[in-house]
Structure formats: structure tokens, C-alpha cells
């Protein structure tokens, strides 16, 4: 089966855009999806967000790419078929799929609704599925997914602006909840104002926190405070501004994926403050231990969220009208979008209009 052409592996014909090599250039690909199983939902993909992880993966920057690679793990659509044992979805329902499509369902993490930390977690693309075949993501016309790994999208949510919540949204929501930074009146710092950072500001404000954005870019102050609603803004390269913010934060969500010093940020925390890393720098960061000891501070990491938590996040976002700030693009613009993403030239997430612009050839 490994030698079969992608379009012949499974019975359902599918079409998407794939990278063939480390250039990361995406182009049309005919492939196939499995038949709808007893516990599967099949859905037509309407929108798919473009995540920075997609860019890393298609260029094999993490060394784990398998080609052809169809990326995309911020996927929303409408159900077209359900298996005979599916209980939670019906044809016509709006659904979303995030970063994973499988897990062992029996380990301690899975039993605690933390499928995202299962050692056998199956990623939405670039992973080996239970049947030994390669998983393909949402830059495609249809998806087939086990119902456990789909979330329901409430009717009042705009599907295009909801897609990025399935990765960026839950990536910041999960640590805010787990580390109890979701309590009204706390003071939260958000490092970096990009796809993840702007979502952290929105969720933080919805939780009732005071939010300070910390950025290297002074020109983002107006955006952070006046448009996104942050309470204050600190330029991390300005020693006086950093000094005035020392010891003021209950928690920090660090969304930056570039190498950067941790020491100045740890200094912003109050005693027993918590700093959670959600960005993925490509080089190791230097960890100064003494500041952790001095204030009994916590430095932790967090990666996406479990399925129960992802549904909770979507429902919370629906209730508080939280959505991603997006630029909708056609499928044939995706390579240009990747180039712009590499330069940080997007506010704040590209979303592909799959349903209206993916043309089978």
C-alpha cells in the first residue's frame, strides 16, 4: 500500500494542494480518503486556516516531513455523511477538526481528556493512521474523521474566522485554563502579537483579566491597545518600560517562535507567577534558574488542547463573540500566502476559502 499512488489508496476520491519536496511549493494533487466508517463523519471542507506549523512542515524544517504533504489543521466544514454508530453529528452539521485525528483512547492522558498528550496521538497531517496510511490535512475538498476528533461549530459563529481557533485558539485557551489564569482581575502578559498572541489577548480579556502585550515592535501598540483591547503595551527592547513592569504579572503566555531571552520576561512575574511557553523556537533557549528560585516562579509549556477542552473553547468563543482576525485567500494564492507568512505579513491569520476556490483539475 505504501507504493500505491495517493489517489488509489482509499475508495473516496479527493483533491487538494500538496508539497512534493522541501521547497515547500504547493500544487494540486489527486488523492483519496477512506470510506466513512461506523464512527466516522465525512465533511465538505469550507475553510482551512494557514498555521505557521504548516510552513515549517512542508519545508521539512522539523525533519519529520513525509511527501506528498497536504497540510492544514484548522479545518471547518459541513457534514455530508455519518457512520451508523455516530451519535453526535448528522448530515448538515457544521464541524471543525484541529491538530489531531486519533489517539490510543486508553492511556492516562486520553482517559483524562488530554488526547493531545497521548504518546500515540495521530496528527491531522503527516502522521501514520491506524490503517498504516498517511494522514492528509485540510488543504483539500473533503475530510473523513472519527467523530471523537471533530467539534461542533455553533450556528452563530462565522466559519472562516472560526477555523484558526482550532489550533491558535485552543493553544492559548488551554494554558490559561489549566494554569488558572482565567480568573477575573488577574494581570496577564502576552508576549508576541501574531496569530497566537492576538487570540491570547481576546481570551484574556473575555476571562476578565488585565492584559499587557509585550512586543519588540513599538508600532504594534495602537493595534494592541486600541483595536484588540489590551490594557497596556510594553516594548521589550526598552529597558525603562520593562523595569516599570517588573513584578506586575500573575502569568505570561509566551507565543514567540523565534529565539529570545527569557530572563527579562521572568522578571515581569510576581512571586509565584507562571510563564507558559506556547511558541516553538527553532533553537534552544537559555534558562536562568535563579529567577525561578527567587520567586517560586513556574516556567511551563503547553501544546494545543484535548477534545473536550477544544469544544469548551469553541463554545466559550461563541458565547463571547471571539474570532480570529483573518485574511481570506483563494487556494491558488497559498504559495504567496506562505511567503508572506514567513515575513510576518498577515494580520493575523490566512484562511483559505476552500469550498469556493479549490478547483479539481
UniProtKB/Swiss-Prot annotation:
Gene3D superfamilies: Medium-chain alcohol dehydrogenases, catalytic domain, NAD(P)-binding Rossmann-like Domain. It catalyses: D-mannitol + NAD(+) = D-mannose + NADH + H(+). Keywords: Metal-binding, NAD, Oxidoreductase, Zinc. Zn(2+) 1 binds at residues 51, 73, 167. InterPro entries: ADH-like_C (IPR013149), ADH-like_N (IPR013154), ADH_Zn_CS (IPR002328), CAD-like (IPR047109), GroES-like_sf (IPR011032), NAD(P)-bd_dom_sf (IPR036291), PKS_ER (IPR020843). Pfam families: ADH_N, ADH_zinc_N. Belongs to the zinc-containing alcohol dehydrogenase family. Oxidizes mannitol to mannose. Provides the initial step by which translocated mannitol is committed to central metabolism and, by regulating mannitol pool size, is important in regulating salt tolerance at the cellular level. This is Probable mannitol dehydrogenase. It comes from Mesembryanthemum crystallinum.
Amino acid at each position: 500500500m505504501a507504493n500505491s499512488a495517493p489517489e488509489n489508496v482509499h475508495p473516496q476520491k479527493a483533491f487538494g494542494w500538496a508539497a512534493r519536496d522541501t521547497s515547500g511549493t504547493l500544487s494540486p494533487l489527486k488523492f483519496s480518503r477512506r470510506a466513512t466508517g461506523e464512527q466516522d463523519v465525512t465533511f465538505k471542507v469550507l475553510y482551512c486556516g494557514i498555521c505557521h506549523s504548516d510552513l515549517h512542515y512542508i519545508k521539512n524544517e522539523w525533519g519529520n516531513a513525509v511527501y506528498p504533504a497536504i497540510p492544514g489543521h484548522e479545518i471547518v466544514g459541513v457534514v455530508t455523511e455519518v457512520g451508523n454508530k455516530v451519535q453526535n453529528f448528522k448530515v448538515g452539521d457544521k464541524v471543525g477538526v484541529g491538530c489531531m485525528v486519533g489517539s490510543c483512547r486508553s492511556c492516562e492522558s486520553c482517559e483524562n481528556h488530554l488526547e493531545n498528550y497521548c504518546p500515540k496521538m495521530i496528527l491531522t497531517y503527516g502522521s501514520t493512521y491506524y490503517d498504516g496510511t498517511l494522514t492528509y490535512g485540510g488543504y483539500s475538498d473533503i475530510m473523513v474523521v472519527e467523530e471523537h476528533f471533530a467539534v461542533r461549530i455553533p450556528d452563530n459563529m462565522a466559519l472562516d474566522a472560526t477555523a484558526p481557533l482550532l489550533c491558535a485558539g485552543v493553544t492559548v485557551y488551554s494554558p490559561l485554563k489549566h494554569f488558572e489564569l482565567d480568573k477575573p482581575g488577574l494581570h496577564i502578559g502576552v508576549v508576541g502579537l501574531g496569530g497566537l498572541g492576538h487570540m491570547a489577548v481576546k481570551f484574556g480579556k473575555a476571562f476578565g483579566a488585565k492584559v499587557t502585550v509585550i512586543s519588540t515592535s513599538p508600532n504594534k501598540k495602537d493595534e494592541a491597545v486600541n483595536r484588540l483591547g489590551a490594557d497596556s503595551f510594553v516594548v521589550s527592547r526598552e529597558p525603562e518600560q520593562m523595569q516599570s513592569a517588573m513584578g506586575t504579572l500573575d502569568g505570561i503566555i509566551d507565543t514567540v517562535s523565534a529565539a529570545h531571552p527569557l530572563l527579562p520576561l521572568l522578571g515581569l512575574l510576581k512571586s509565584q507567577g507562571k510563564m507558559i511557553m506556547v511558541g516553538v523556537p527553532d533553537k534552544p533557549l537559555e534558562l536562568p534558574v535563579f529567577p525561578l528560585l527567587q520567586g517560586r516562579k513556574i516556567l511551563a509549556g503547553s501544546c494545543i488542547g484535548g477534545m473536550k477542552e477544544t469544544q469548551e473553547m469553541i463554545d466559550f468563543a461563541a458565547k463571547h463573540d471571539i474570532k480570529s482576525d483573518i485574511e481570506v485567500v483563494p487556494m491558488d494564492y497559498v504559495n504567496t500566502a506562505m511567503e508572506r507568512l514567513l515575513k510576518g505579513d498577515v494580520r493575523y491569520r490566512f484562511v483559505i476559502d476552500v469550498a469556493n476556490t479549490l478547483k479539481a483539475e
